[in-house]
């Protein structure tokens, strides 16, 4: 069986989007697709649509409801949607532009509280009091939320969208990803970690239509590197940096001082991380750098100012 990747385009809600179409060719020359491969190309299209129109992603829609401590049906009532609409959005349906903007706006808890007050006639007194109390708690915690957003802006140069493979921007996920890699591979030089993260993200995009770390990458002389990699590796107390002398050169190794909490990662994400770590664990920093130099993702974008496009995931040779 041979996997075939072909550039295609699709009109979605009146707009044309480019994507990579995935099919399989058997020994008799017959081509076919699977539910999974069709899902990957559809994700490429719908994620571009979400990014273009600032429509929240599925994980953001779920996280918003959980932050406010409400059921999906109650969110629909307060937002003025159909009874099951919010639940459908949590299952992957893409909101309309107007509903997407509504969901985006109520990520501000004060805006949501105004809507709760406007919907009071549709809530029991007990429901109303409980929701208001929760929203007051959320608003009181806004300083903590703004601190997290400041850290996100500091670590992730590119916002969520095409440049970062549509991955969530989360410092907790990034920290635990680093800790997990170090737990699997042991102390790891920064130069090697750069390539490991690249392969994890680009393999994830190829297999799922979405990256994992939230990072975007540039192609420099020594291979693909995450944007702001120096800030990333110094951002977490649980990731220590140690200078070591290797062949008369000072190199910085990363060491984990805590165990990773992988509760925020899916089974599919963890399987991809494990696959890359297993393949790269025995490679030296020099070996993995040489491997990355075989990648069209690096060769086609060396010394260019823009980030490496995630569409290059479909030309990976190292994994």
Each language-model region and where it sits:
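Short, basic-rich loop-to-helix N-cap that marks the start of a DNA-contacting helix
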Residues: 93-105
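N-terminal flexible/basic segments that precede or flank functional cores
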Residues: 1-53, 123-126
């Amino acid at each position: 069986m041979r996997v075939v990747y072909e550039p295609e385009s699709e009109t979605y809600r009146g707009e044309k989007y480019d994507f990579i179409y995935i099919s399989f060719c058997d020994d008799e020359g017959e081509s076919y697709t699977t539910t999974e491969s069709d899902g990957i190309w559809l994700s490429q299209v719908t994620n571009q649509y979400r990014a273009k129109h600032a429509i929240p992603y599925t994980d953001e829609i779920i996280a918003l409801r959980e932050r406010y401590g409400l059921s999906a049906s109650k969110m629909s009532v307060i937002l003025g949607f159909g009874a099951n609409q919010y639940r459908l959005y949590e299952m992957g349906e893409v909101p309309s532009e107007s509903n997407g903007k509504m969901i985006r706006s109520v990520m501000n808890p004060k805006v949501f509280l105004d809507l709760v007050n406007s919907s009071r006639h549709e809530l029991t007194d007990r429901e109303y009091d409980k929701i208001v109390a929760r929203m007051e708690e959320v608003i009181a915690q806004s300083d903590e939320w703004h601190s997290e957003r400041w850290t996100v802006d500091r670590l992730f140069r590119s916002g969520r969208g095409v440049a970062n493979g549509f991955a969530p921007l989360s410092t907790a996920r990034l920290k635990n990803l680093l800790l997990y890699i170090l737990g699997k591979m042991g102390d790891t030089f920064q130069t090697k970690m750069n390539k490991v993260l690249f392969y994890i993200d680009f393999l994830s995009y190829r297999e799922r239509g979405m990256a994992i770390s939230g990072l975007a990458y540039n192609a420099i002389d020594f291979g693909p590197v995450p944007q702001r990699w120096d800030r990333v590796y110094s951002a977490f107390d649980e990731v220590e940096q140690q200078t070591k002398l290797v062949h008369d050169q000072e190199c910085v190794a990363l060491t984990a001082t805590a165990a990773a909490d992988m509760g925020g990662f899916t089974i599919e994400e963890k399987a991809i991380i494990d696959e890359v770590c297993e393949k790269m664990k025995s490679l030296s920093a020099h070996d993995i750098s040489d491997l990355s130099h075989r990648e069209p993702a690096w060769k086609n974008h060396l010394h260019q100012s823009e980030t490496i496009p995630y569409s290059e995931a479909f030309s990976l040779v190292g994994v």
